[in-house]
Amino acid sequence: MLEILQLFLLIHLITIEQLVTGRNWKGTAFGGWKSRTEVPRLVQSVMRGEMDLKPFITHKIEGLENVNKSIEALHGGTCLRAVIQIAKNEMPKADLPVLKSNVKLEGGWMKQFQHWSEACQCDMTFSIFVPERKNRSDPDPPVLYYLSGLTCTDENARTKAHFAQEAGSVGLAVVFPDTSPRGVTIEGQDDSYDFGSGAGFYLNATSSKWSKHYKMYDYVTKELPELVSKLFPVDGKRVSIMGHSMGGHGALISHLKNPGKYVSVSAFSPICNPTKCAWGEKAFTGYLGSVEAGKEYDATELIRNFPKVHQAPILIDQGTADGFLANQLLPKNLTSAAAAAGYMPINLRMQPGYDHSYYFISTFMKDHIQHHATALGVRAKL
């Protein structure tokens, strides 16, 4: 794509909202390009830090009143394409994500980014698998969010879960958020594995000590999806969610607190009734001030009043040899509450002999990808 770009008309930095892509520009500024698809994808790659425009800038024309000069340049035979920013406001450098890594995987790309989070008031890191686009006319892929468990980062599942072959085959983008804020100074946040760093529990903390940074619920359900939709060629309206352990808890409550937001849900070994287990009691007391307040983030409590019209299919796999099953995970509490509430599309599969590890997850990951692919209406391409 670079070799055909000879002119970029810029004021400062290009953003999706500031890109001229209206019908008036078709056949002029953008020539034969699909102005509503190809140009936004190009701009997204610039915003992600994957393309440096500086070597291709030949003109800088400021102000809407001077747009005619760009038309003259375009029709003067000195360039082929132009991207124009007409807004005066510039995007601060700190608001642009930083590309940390970019690796080819199963025909697509596994990318890792760092960005400033308004929700968590710190730099956050996430990874995303972007599947291969075989044809330019292919629709943007739907998105699956994978929430990891205690002690994890965005890297655990992307390297251990064996998701990419199936996700790449069906054309499914997969996003891996971190599990807590990082790089902040809070006394006691690194004292234990099940609270603080690596243990954000996907809630919005209200206790004064934690409330500034520990807004993981807002981060994974609002801020990060908005960022992903802006930065990547994905369909942000077709979204599903899954997770493991603490992340399974996060996936369940994200769905149950947002009826209609997620097309499908799945979990490996989720914490299903956290107000009734030690992990949840510790988290809710510390972040929210009481276990009672934690009912707002308890899947078993939330499912009791979930509206029947938005019952997305839920798949749960649970190993029978999981050492946390009896005292921490409590899946039967969830299924009992679901049955009483009339939440029908929930499938709990007890898997004999499997534990809590990524060996278990990788064994059944294909089933989970297929679960979401079916709900999202995508399938393997021939």
Where would I find each of the regions flagged by the language model?
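C-terminal transmembrane module of eukaryotic multi-pass membrane proteins
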Residues: 25, 33, 314-318
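Glycine-rich cofactor phosphate-binding loops and adjacent beta1-alpha1 units
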Residues: 1-28, 66-68
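Short, conserved catalytic or adaptor-binding loops enriched in Gly and charged residues
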Residues: 15-22, 45-50, 102-106
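Non-catalytic cap/lid and distal C-terminal segments of serine-dependent acyl enzymes
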Residues: 92-382
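C-terminal hydrophobic helical "lid"/dimerization subdomain
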Residues: 34-90
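Short strand-turn motif at the edge of the Rossmann-like AdoMet-binding core
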Residues: 3-7, 29-32, 57, 178-179, ...
